[in-house]
Regions:
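A helix-coil-helix interface module used to build multimeric assemblies
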Residues: 1-202, 207-214, 220, 275-276, ...
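Glycine-rich cofactor/substrate-binding loops
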Residues: 2-37, 98-99, 280-459
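Generic, well-ordered alpha-helical scaffold segments in large soluble proteins
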Residues: 41, 62, 66-69, 91, ...
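Conserved hydrophobic residue
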Residues: 51, 75, 264-265, 380, ...
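Alpha-helix capping and helix-loop boundary segments enriched in small/acidic/polar residues
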Residues: 104, 109-112, 156-163, 167, ...
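Short amphipathic alpha-helical segments with heptad-repeat character
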Residues: 118, 122-129, 133, 140, ...
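Conserved helix-loop functional segments at active or binding sites
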Residues: 145, 182-185, 189, 218-222, ...
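Acidic, glycine-rich loop-and-beta core segments that form the ion-binding/anion-interacting portion
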Residues: 216-308
């Protein structure tokens, strides 16, 4: 059992205690970040004259050889080490001797693990950003191709007003755009280096924390050594942002599941993103969308877990904080997988434009426009609302739609109606006369698509 402590103990650690306490099974995930931090630390120590240049070079060479061997599969990270820090240090000492024992000068595992976690989260935020951006590109492409794909918009899962598929996809574009902004915000707030904070009270060595921070492209050093090692609010922020991404993916998945059903038939999911049944040969199931929806709770659970872990911990570091890693690693991997699969699914999905438009023609999605027609002819809106309500009731009784009513039937309910009512309530007219920015009309949506392209090219 390789440990970085033990001098003041008279007994060996109980095997059960060792296994319970060890984190090597999961913190090996930031092996590369641990080495990155150690290389920066050693470089700074030599700059400050705490290590010689020769010692620095020997240690750096040793660290590079460890990375090369691990990456090549020649060196295995095993459970005989308590954590990734002890794995790196023990192997370094084996390779370079006494120089390796100086690696930890002016450093505690508390600031070391805080640094590793920040480096890891920072790297993963950049990967998540790429995935969200690609999803935005996919959405904008669908928008551009479907400016005239008419469909019903819904409230309460009931047909409400006619829109376009471009407009519907645009709603999700805005959601994921904000998700991307949240990731950027987190990156900016967390991008300060904790290295040099020690266990909680800094160190007596003349460290150059600004230099260490610059070597790893941080904005600068953190300004309170206790806060540096004692908080994981950036992890909580990340898990909150990931939960919001998953909430958006889950809502989108729910709609795709509904749209893919035989009752709606708005879309057909590609075979590559569908599965079948072991007993029912006719089935083609939207399992990817269902799994994305299901995995949302998994990410929510990670957020609630770290919030609960951190809520009662006195300053500074406590071992409870070791519990931040597995759930964060899992949440990040889950969201990355969901984003990639979801992007592939919607980019290959077939939209049934004729079914969508036909659906918009039924269900009285043009009722609001019939009321607006009356208002434009001098009828107060509240009266117009009541008149159109009676029209809908009449149509329901007759089993017809508003555009199937004769002019005589219209006039029986209100003499204001004339022949131009039919153009006013045509689904395409209903959509296209909505031209303000943010509305579903094709001219308005063209502008949005171009704004989206500009945003994606600049960000």
């Amino acid at each position: 059992m390789a440990q970085l402590w033990g001098g003041r103990f008279t007994k060996e650690t109980d095997k059960l205690v060792y296994n319970f306490n060890a984190s090597i099974g999961f913190d090996q995930k930031f092996f590369h970040q641990d080495v990155q931090g150690s290389k920066a630390h050693v470089t700074m120590l030599a700059k400050q004259g705490i290590l010689t240049e020769n010692e620095r070079d020997v240690i750096l060479k040793g660290l590079d050889s460890i990375v090369a061997d691990v990456d090549a599969g020649k060196l295995e990270i095993t459970s005989e080490y308590e954590d990734i820090h002890s794995f790196v240090e023990a192997n370094l000492i084996d390779r370079v001797g006494d120089a390796g024992k100086k690696l930890h000068t002016g450093r505690s595992r508390n600031d070391q693990v805080a640094l590793d976690m920040k480096l890891y989260v920072r790297d993963e935020i950049q990967e998540l950003d790429k995935l969200v951006k690609h999803l935005l590109e996919t959405l904008n492409k669908i928008m551009e191709e479907n400016l005239h794909t008419y469909m019903p918009g819904f409230t309460h899962l009931q047909k409400a007003q006619p829109i376009t598929l471009a407009h519907h996809m645009g709603a999700y574009f805005e959601m994921f755009k904000r998700d991307r902004s949240r990731l950027s915000d987190i990156y900016g707030r967390m991008n300060y280096c904790p290295l040099g904070s020690g266990a909680l009270a800094g160190t007596t060595y003349p460290l150059d924390r600004e230099y260490s921070a610059s070597l790893m492209e941080f904005e600068g050093p953190t300004l309170n050594s206790m806060d540096s090692v004692a908080d994981r609010d950036y992890v909580i922020e990340l898990l909150s942002a990931l939960s919001t991404i998953m909430m958006h993916l889950s809502r989108f998945s729910e709609e795709i599941i509904i749209w893919n059903s035989n009752e709606y038939r708005f879309v057909e999911i590609d075979d590559a993103y569908s599965t079948g049944s072991s007993i029912m040969p006719q089935k083609k199931n939207p399992d990817i969308a269902e799994l994305v929806r299901g995995k949302t709770g998994r990410v929510y659970g990670a957020l609630m877990s770290i919030l609960t872990t951190m809520k009662g911990i006195p300053l500074a570091y406590n071992k409870d904080m070791q519990e931040d890693k597995e759930l964060t690693f899992d949440a990040i991997d889950t969201v990355k997988g969901c984003l990639a699969l979801f992007d592939g699914m919607i980019s290959t999905m077939k939209f049934r434009n004729d079914v969508m438009e036909d659906s918009a023609k039924h269900g009285f999605t043009n009722a609001t426009d019939a009321a607006d027609y009356l208002v434009n002819h001098g009828v107060p809106f509240r009266d117009a609302h009541g008149i159109v309500g009676r029209l809908v009731l009449y149509c329901l009784d007759k089993g017809i739609s508003l555009d199937e009513m004769s002019l005589e039937e219209y006039k029986e309910i209100s003499p204001v109606f004339e022949n131009d009512i039919y153009d006013a309530i045509s689904i395409r007219t209903c959509v296209e006369k909505r031209m303000t920015i943010g509305a579903p009309g094709s001219e308005a949506m063209k502008k949005v698509v171009e704004l989206n392209k500009k945003y994606l090219s600049e960000n």
